[in-house]
């Protein structure tokens, strides 16, 4: 549950007639494997479900729980609260695939804020970073990124706009109506 949203079920919130989670799943529709960390729920697309250990341990624990199911060379790591992420997916994939030295490509907002949960990883780099943070309860995602060479993918369009507050959710709903 999202603390800044009063404990609301963030992935289940509706933007543009779809849940936040379904909007993110639409963005990765072509993926061979789609893994979602969190409690099971109905989704518009079939996914593999995993739970972080312990439940509620945070994004790194969720990423670790799902990482073993991925067989592709590149792994997208996307938060469930990114309703406009679809157009960013090719940019993220292209950035990490086009730079042999890079382990991860992350969206960077116009303000300069890096969105570590809007990222494309070389799967080998992600697994190595997860090994470095293993056993660290509540490790921040930036700790994973710090263990790898990162490419910044500018996001002037706001594709990585996330919904952490009610005002941000209202903004996402307004964007979806345009």
Question: Which residues make up each language-model segment?
Answer:
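Nucleotide and nucleotide-moiety/phosphate-recognizing core
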Residues: 1-138, 146-159, 166-170, 177
């Amino acid at each position: 549950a999202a603390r800044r949203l009063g404990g609301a079920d963030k992935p289940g919130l509706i933007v543009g007639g779809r849940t936040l989670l379904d909007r993110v799943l639409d963005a990765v529709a072509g993926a061979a494997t789609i893994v979602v960390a969190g409690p099971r729920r109905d989704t518009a697309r079939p996914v593999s479900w995993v739970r972080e250990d312990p439940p509620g341990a945070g994004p790194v624990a969720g990423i670790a729980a799902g990482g073993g199911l991925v067989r592709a060379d590149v792994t997208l790591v996307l938060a469930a609260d990114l309703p406009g992420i679809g157009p960013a997916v090719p940019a993220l994939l292209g950035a990490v695939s086009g730079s042999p030295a890079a382990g991860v490509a992350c969206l960077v907002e116009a303000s300069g804020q890096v969105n570590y949960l809007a990222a494309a990883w070389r799967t080998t780099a992600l697994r190595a970073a997860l090994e470095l943070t293993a056993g660290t309860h509540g490790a921040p995602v930036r700790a994973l990124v710090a263990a790898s060479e990162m490419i910044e993918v500018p996001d002037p369009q706001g594709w990585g706009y996330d919904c952490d507050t009610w005002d941000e959710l209202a903004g996402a709903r307004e964007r979806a109506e345009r």
